């Protein structure tokens, strides 16, 4: 399934290069127009990142998010600076279907695993940004990739599997925002090792060939941000090159999960 992604600063559509606020690109679209275009092109899930909220949770873009989270035909996942349970409650109450949790999921896994149990595995998405060293070790930097958490991927997932985690958005940070191709080996490895998790691949998608390369890995979703905003291909083209069985399953899950919107 293709998952269009939109990053927001001050209510405007932007992209950061490898998470760097100093390397920001603004796009001349409104978030509402982009969402509607993606819906008309066949998107059933969308991913929004509140970059203001990521910097300061008191500056969350609630007015803007309110206009997009209640879309009748889409599952909406929202992330950016979730630091406490009140943030989770706030986003779910706003209408988000899933809350995406990054740094806190790494720093305080006991707390976040409790949220998985409290709100259900369909409501929480772990956002794990992975740094791979020369020896192949997978560590998890936090707070905009500035801090080394000292935590590796396998140890962290062992804790979350016990809680029944279902959705993990996984980014190889060396690929993010580059359009230079994705880390196929990484996704093949994690999908084989953790088959009960629905993996969302993120970072580096710059062509339809990059999407097709992910098909054998077993990922359930592909995050598309800059590539769609800059017209590298259309969403219709991306959806068309993904296996029909996966698309049908996604549509089935979407219709069952959005019935109360």
From Swiss-Prot:
- Active site feature: 7 (proton acceptor), 129 (proton donor)
* Pathway named in the protein's UniProt entry: Amino-acid biosynthesis; L-histidine biosynthesis; L-histidine from 5-phospho-alpha-D-ribose 1-diphosphate: step 4/9
Q: Does the keyword Amino-acid biosynthesis apply?
A: yes
Q: Which InterPro entries match?
A: Aldolase_TIM (IPR013785), His_biosynth (IPR006062), HisA_bact_arch (IPR006063), Isoase_HisA-like (IPR044524), Isoase_HisA-like_bact (IPR023016), RibuloseP-bd_barrel (IPR011060)
One MF term from GO for this chain? 1-(5-phosphoribosyl)-5-[(5-phosphoribosylamino)methylideneamino]imidazole-4-carboxamide isomerase activity
Q: What is this protein called?
A: 1-(5-phosphoribosyl)-5-[(5-phosphoribosylamino)methylideneamino] imidazole-4-carboxamide isomerase
Q: GO CC: one term?
A: cytoplasm
Per its record, the protein catalyses: 1-(5-phospho-beta-D-ribosyl)-5-[(5-phospho-beta-D-ribosylamino)methylideneamino]imidazole-4-carboxamide = 5-[(5-phospho-1-deoxy-D-ribulos-1-ylimino)methylamino]-1-(5-phospho-beta-D-ribosyl)imidazole-4-carboxamide
| Organism classification | Bacteria, Pseudomonadati, Pseudomonadota, Gammaproteobacteria, Alteromonadales
Q: Its Gene Ontology biological processes?
A: L-histidine biosynthetic process; L-tryptophan biosynthetic process
Name where it mostly resides: cytoplasm
The cellular location(s) given in this protein's UniProt record come to: Cytoplasm
- Family per similarity comment: Belongs to the HisA/HisF family.
Keyword annotations for this protein? Amino-acid biosynthesis, Cytoplasm, Histidine biosynthesis, Isomerase
CDD domains with a match to the protein in the record: HisA (cd04732)
Lineage top rank: taxon: Bacteria
Which EC number(s) are documented for this chain?
5.3.1.16
Disulfide-bonded cysteines: none
């Amino acid at each position: 399934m293709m998952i269009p992604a939109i990053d927001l600063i001050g209510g405007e559509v932007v992209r950061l290069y490898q998470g760097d606020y100093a390397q920001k690109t603004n796009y001349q679209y409104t978030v509402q127009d982009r969402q509607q275009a993606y819906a008309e092109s066949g998107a059933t899930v969308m991913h929004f990142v509140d970059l203001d909220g990521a910097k300061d949770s008191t500056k969350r873009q609630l007015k803007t998010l309110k206009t997009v989270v209640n879309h009748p035909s889409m599952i909406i996942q929202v992330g950016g600076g979730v630091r406490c349970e009140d943030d989770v409650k706030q986003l779910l109450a706003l209408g988000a279907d899933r809350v995406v949790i990054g740094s806190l999921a790494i720093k305080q896994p006991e707390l976040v695993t409790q949220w998985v149990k409290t709100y259900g595995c369909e409501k929480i998405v772990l956002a794990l940004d992975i740094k791979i060293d020369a020896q192949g070790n997978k560590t998890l930097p936090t707070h905009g990739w500035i801090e080394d958490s000292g935590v590796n991927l396998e140890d962290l997932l062992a804790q979350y599997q016990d809680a029944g985690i279902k959705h993990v958005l996984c980014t190889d940070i060396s690929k993010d925002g580059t359009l230079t191709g994705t880390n196929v080996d990484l996704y093949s490895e994690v999908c084989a090792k953790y088959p009960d998790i629905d993996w969302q691949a993120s970072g580096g998608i710059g062509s339809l060939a990059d999407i097709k390369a992910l098909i054998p890995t077993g990922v359930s979703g592909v995050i598309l941000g800059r590539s769609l905003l800059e017209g590298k291909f259309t969403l219709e083209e991306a959806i068309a090159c993904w296996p029909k069985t996966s698309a049908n399953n996604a549509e089935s899950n979407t219709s069952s999960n959005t019935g109360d919107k």
